[in-house]
């Protein structure tokens, strides 16, 4: 075979374009033709951490006032009928109840962390109440 002289050709600047797969082409064309955009979602745990920071900063009561007041009156009915409550008495009960629950959940969280978990479970609450001596 005889040798031939090679002439220099102009470079096109890279590789030749490849054919796209059918799925990729369909995915790229879908939003352009009016596909429905997904609503924005935060990663799991982000909103939870934001809520923790928000509620730790705040001082307002978290249990609604009227449902708590109805519960207090319902429990009081079992002991004596026709009891009246000052609004400040119901507020004091609510403050005490919320403080108790916050402390309970703090200790419950510590029990879950001790068990190398991040999720609190009923057994954590039971352990806390046994350690505190509230329930034998």
Swiss-Prot record:
Residue numbers of N6-succinyllysine PTMs: 15, 57, 80, 123
Modified residues (N6-glutaryllysine): 15, 19, 24, 28, 57, 80, 116, 123
An MF annotation (GO) of this entry: structural constituent of chromatin
Modification Phosphotyrosine, positions: 42
Positions of modified residues (N6-butyryllysine): 19, 24
Pfam families to which the protein is assigned, alphabetical: Histone
InterPro entries: Histone-fold, Histone_H2A/H2B/H3, Histone_H3/CENP-A
Keywords: Acetylation, ADP-ribosylation, Chromosome, Citrullination, DNA-binding, Hydroxylation, Methylation, Nucleosome core, Nucleus, Phosphoprotein, Ubl conjugation
Modification sites for 5-glutamyl dopamine: 6
Modified residues (5-glutamyl serotonin): 6
Residue numbers of Citrulline PTMs: 3, 9, 18, 27
Protein name: Histone H3-7
Organism: Homo sapiens
């Amino acid at each position: 075979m005889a040798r031939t002289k090679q002439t220099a050709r102009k470079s096109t600047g890279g590789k030749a374009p490849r054919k796209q797969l059918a799925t990729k082409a369909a995915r790229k064309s879908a939003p352009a033709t009016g596909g429905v955009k997904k609503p924005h979602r935060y990663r799991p745990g982000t909103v939870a951490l934001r809520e923790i920071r928000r509620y730790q900063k705040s001082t307002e009561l978290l249990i609604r006032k009227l449902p708590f007041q109805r519960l207090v009156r319902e429990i009081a009915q079992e002991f004596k009928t026709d009891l009246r409550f000052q609004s400040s008495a119901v507020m004091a009960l609510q403050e005490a109840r919320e403080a108790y629950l916050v402390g309970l959940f703090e200790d419950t969280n510590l029990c879950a962390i001790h068990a190398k978990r991040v999720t609190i479970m009923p057994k954590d609450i039971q352990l806390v109440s046994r350690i505190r001596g509230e329930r034998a």
